[in-house]
Amino acid sequence: MRVLALDSSGIVASVAVVEDDILVAEYTVNYKKTHSQTLLPMLDEIVKMTELDLKTIDAIAVAKGPGSFTGLRIGSATAKGLGLALDKPLVGIPTVEALAYNLYDVNGLICPIMDARRKQVYTGIYRYEDHRLMTVKDQMAVGIEELLSMLNDMGEAVTFLGDGVPVFKDIIADKLTVPFSFAPAHLSRQRAGAVGALGVLYYKEGRTETAAEHKPVSYTHLTLPTR
């Protein structure tokens, strides 16, 4: 099956085409341009380079949040427009889950962190079991120190990734008592290839929605842990 994937949930803009277990093309830009300037030209370039007939895709996978309010709405509007025009289903992928999928089969806990300002992060905690990504703690918004306290209580090694790493690197080093590491540059930000790969899995599990049904996840929809 063939999935077109979009991620504009953060500073990074990314577009990809995934066919079953093959990443056909991926275009990712992490630069000071707005997604309204980059996303559609990137999509157009991928379509041209791969000679893709958009009518042949089976679904559109899109990072549904959390993340940048404006970025999410640009990605959502693009995906919804394509879904309506092509009469194709959408597959909404949690942003932090797609980030965790970048670190396929890594040992220990995986903790994507996206800077939500005011010492808060959008995050979730994951691990791999039998080559499958498992959720340890659901997607949530939480203070960075509270997150680090959770991880200390779990007592396991953890790998961090996401745009929150450069913001909170020092406090992680200061407060965390368990072994930790940071993902390398090529895996540390949003990638539409991961969104597309998860989109294939979700589609096969029947986890699709219509363009009319799709809504990005905002901060108010996230779980706030009890203090």
Give names to the regions the model predicted:
Residues 16, 122-126, 217:
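Conserved hydrophobic/aromatic positions in well-ordered beta-strands
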Residues 1-64, 189:
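N-terminal beta-alpha supersecondary unit
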Residues 220-226:
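Conserved small/polar residues in nucleotide/adenosyl-binding loops
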Residues 184-218:
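Glycine-rich phosphate-binding/hydrolytic loop that grips phosphoryl groups
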Residues 61-90, 95:
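DPxDG-like acidic metal-binding loop motif
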Residues 22, 89-188:
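Surface "functional belts" at beta-alpha junctions
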Residues 3-5, 61, 71, 110-113:
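Short glycine-aspartate micro-motif
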